[in-house]
Amino acid sequence: MTPFLLVLSSPSGGGKTTIARSLLQARTDVGYSVSATTRPPRPGERDGHDYHFLTGAEFERRVVAGEFLEHATYGGHRYGTLRAEIDRVLGNGCHAVLDIEVEGARQVMDRMPDAVRVFVLPPSAKVLVERLRSRDTETPATRRVRLARAAEELLA
């Protein structure tokens, strides 16, 4: 089978990363595209494995240089997919998996209409709230912003 791009998208806390990790563990012909972000690492996250952690200036330099397939601001931080990451995975003969937020997925589909997009619905609003709370990585104000954005994305 010809390698393809699989785009998993959902609101923050929707379950896309959990699904991506399960897929990567179950299949040897799937590779993960590591996203870039300006947010600080969460406990246990590693640069180049979970994300490419960039400064705001470095992120902007790469945007201007056209290195991103997609990028967006979410929860006060910038996130994006480096074209080189997709090329790396597909070039190794593997299917590439992205787990990205909803606006980024729209941008990818505009630029790569042959990609397969899966929108991941959280089981319920209550579960989504609990997932974000259990992360314990955000302030209540930031969590409210993420939940408001999630509501918009789920209604879109």
Identify the function of each model-found stretch.
Residues 35-96, 102-103:
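ATP-dependent small-molecule kinase phosphotransfer cores
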